[in-house]
Amino acid sequence: MNFKSLLLCTFIGLSSLAQAETVHVATAGSLKTLVDTTGRVIDNLTLTGTVNRSDLRYLRNHVKQLNLKDVTIAEETVGKVLYPDNVMPDSVFIGDKVLANVVLPASIAEIGKCAFKEVRGAAFTVDFSNCKHLQLIRANAFSESSLQEANLAGLTALQLIDAYAFYWTDIKSISLEGCSSLIMLGERAFCNDYFVTSVNLKGCTSLQTVGNRAFLNLAKQSGDAGTLDFSETAIESFDASSLQSTKIKTVIFPATLKTLGDKVLNLSKVTNMKFLGSVPPKVGAQWMMASALKHVKITVPAGAVAAYAAAFKLSGEDAKNLTDTNGATLGIDGVTTPAISAQKRYNMSGQRVGRDYKGLVIVNGKKVVK
């Protein structure tokens, strides 16, 4: 390395260091006296101490990477509006065109309405990993932002993802793994998230309701979000259009399911459905296109084929893809019959025999007396 190159590398290194700042805020509301944002964008800012809504709002459009992990948010009243403590304030970063990464405070219990709506920093990411007390993500919290992923894994206190919370973002993946207190996904919570390729719902054992259009148009651009596995949830109801127009291959419905609302899977690309409940759900109007339903592979619990066929109004040729976990299908006159035509039968001399053969036979490698 020549001398000029060495000087250049040193200059770049010093410039980068100069842009990384750590500031302790001893008194909420005093950030303006500690950080000058006039005509500048800070590459990397870490705050500690106590801040309020005014402090955070002051940073809007002035910071690329913001670490708030060790910050406590204090209550503040602005005009007639009260911004509570331990809540990421409503609309605090709305429309920020610079913010690209934020590490959320470990102490917050709630993310307010529109807090990060329309944040469009390059490849916007949010670190939720420290938010062990987070209970609520309010309406439009991240809607229409350039957010890259919704990784809420391990947030065991989270109870509600409100309406439009992650509406029309750039997220590629959704992980709610281990969100054991999550009860509800609100209306259009993940609607129009076109680029999603995976959804993880493992451990969402308290989830009861998926709201109207919650996953509408999921993966419209990516083309395949894989499997939506609700098997570990306690969902009783999927509201109208909640999975409409989704680009997913497989849906696994829980044993607790009671209702599938109007147009739940209308215009979706589902090719496999598995129902874990022995009693079929009540289905709303056009819950799935009739032309699509008869081509979808449907698996139900043992002995439940007839009940599901009746509930879904499937019969004859249209019911050929409906089977139970034992391989039973809907036979003639609505009688369920095991799918045994493929069984190979041999007598003790090794000769292939038919189903009517009497005596000791070997069926698929096992001895059976007929």
Report the location of each language-model feature.
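Consensus positions within tandem repeat domains that build extended binding/scaffold surfaces
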Residues: 90-92, 112-115, 138-141, 162-165, ...
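Sec/Tat signal peptide C-region and signal peptidase I cleavage site
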Residues: 14-20
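Sec-dependent N-terminal signal peptides
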Residues: 5-14
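Residue-level detector of functionally pivotal "anchor" positions at catalytic/ligand-binding pockets or at interdomain
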Residues: 326-349
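Terminal processing/anchoring signals of secreted or surface-associated proteins
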Residues: 45, 308, 331-334, 350, ...
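C-terminal tail/sorting-segment detector
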Residues: 2-3, 360-370
